[in-house]
Amino acid sequence: MLTALNRYWDYLRIERQMSPHTITNYQHQLDATIKILAQQDIHAWTQVTPSVVRFILAESKKQGLKEKSLALRLSALRRFLSFLVQQGELKVNPTTGISAPKQGKHLPKNMDGEQVQQLLANDSKEPIDIRDRAILELMYSSGLRLSELQGLDLNSINTRVREVRVIGKGNKERVVPFGRYASHAIQEWLKVRALFNPKDEALFVSQLGNRISHRAIQKRLETWGIRQGLNSHLNPHKLRHSFATHMLEASSDLRAVQELLGHSNLSTTQIYTHLNFQHLAEVYDQAHPRAKRKK
């Protein structure tokens, strides 16, 4: 089983050029799957049948996995078994026709304009704070994913024309604009970046000079949010969701927001129309003479 997996990781890394972060996620899911199979004395991929796949999902749910994680586990297994079919090691993919439990629609949480101002109202001159402010400004200004921001190099950014070249999901490249506040914050960071003794061309580096990790970015944002007095937990998703919601509220251009976010399907972007409708409903309730509630 492990031999086939090792060939699969090489395939994803070399031929598909998948990001290390995505590969790590798949590894985690398939490692957990192998443990479940071992409990059933299944030690070969040819022994995996549709009923075994359903058992994996049921056992994973019993272990506490939520709908989103179950979908990810099934997706990782489906992709791997498809690889084995392509390699001629399996005749059919046993996941065919099996769906993960439907996920409930959870609207992303976002910050309002006042909270964003509160978040970014910090002019500390400490080099690490200058770096973190640049990360915050760029994430909110461009709506980048955590993995996209972490993967930026010095040549990815152009502060003169205020554009950043991003490698998104599926190794797709897109160019995203950013605002003057983000441009200024990045220029300030570039002035002090050398103090961190950078070891490569990464735009954002740790205090050890290495490319800053996903986890470090998450921890720094969380710390920054607490320090700025935000009541809610700050994370990269919240910055991206806030960017999308505020752009949609201001422009109502769903297609443009789709391009900026790097969504391949418009349906993925449409969740923000629910948020936008909530905003419009509030405006309607406050403004329309036949909607105002009696006092």
Curated annotation (Swiss-Prot):
One Pfam family this chain carries?
Answer: Phage_integrase
PROSITE patterns per the UniProt record, alphabetical = CB (PS51900), TYR_RECOMBINASE (PS51898)
Q: Does the keyword Cytoplasm apply?
A: yes
**Which parts of the sequence belong to the Core-binding (CB) domain?**
1-85
Query: Which GO BP terms sit in this record?
Result: cell division; chromosome segregation; DNA transposition
Record bears the keyword DNA-binding: yes
**How would you summarize the oligomeric state and partners of this protein?**
Forms a cyclic heterotetrameric complex composed of two molecules of XerC and two molecules of XerD.
Q: What is this protein called?
A: Tyrosine recombinase XerC
